[in-house]
Amino acid sequence: MDIDAPTDIAILSLTGLGGMRLQAYLRTLDLDVSRYRRVLPHFLDTKAQIVVAGRVGSHAWQYLERETACRVRVVSEERGMQAAGRDASGEARSLLAFHLREVGSARFFVELAELAGVACIDTRPLLAHLGVHASRADRFWSDLGCAEQIEEPFLREFTQAACEAPLPVLLGGHSLVSGGLMLLTEAAWREEDQRLERGT
């Protein structure tokens, strides 16, 4: 797993993976991983549904279909966006962004909660479609759910709405909706196995 964004660090912190040195460093950061922890039980629940959106590859979708008990709604869009330069040229298009522009951030997440109990969103295609040129720092603050730190007005509002949404929302980049979800799924099953071994 590439470490490209704070989401990746939070997931590695929660899962305990990445080696002793990395874990020792992560413990010094005192990261809030509560949003990620709230997502874990959904992967194991046959009645649960999750939404995964963004640059979702077929390998990630197949993994989720095979390794989770929940039902998965996938909105895969703008794969190869950066390599093709569609983000820089303004050609990127996102179904989620079309809807978001029509209903606004607060209603967007309320309606998302009617579809699923969890949302994992790669925000980069959405931002590219909307022409939001947020700094790397702002994108990373958004990934962490720290709306108050974000300077770009739309991204600040969107992130705040995600944090106040009636379902757990994980925001991030491409790795969230690929290797990140795989690690979270593995962590969910590992914790369930440990719970069963303890007999609780």
Annotated model-derived regions:
Residues 1-200:
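Conserved alpha/beta core of the MobA/IspD/sugar-nucleotide pyrophosphorylase nucleotidyltransferase superfamily
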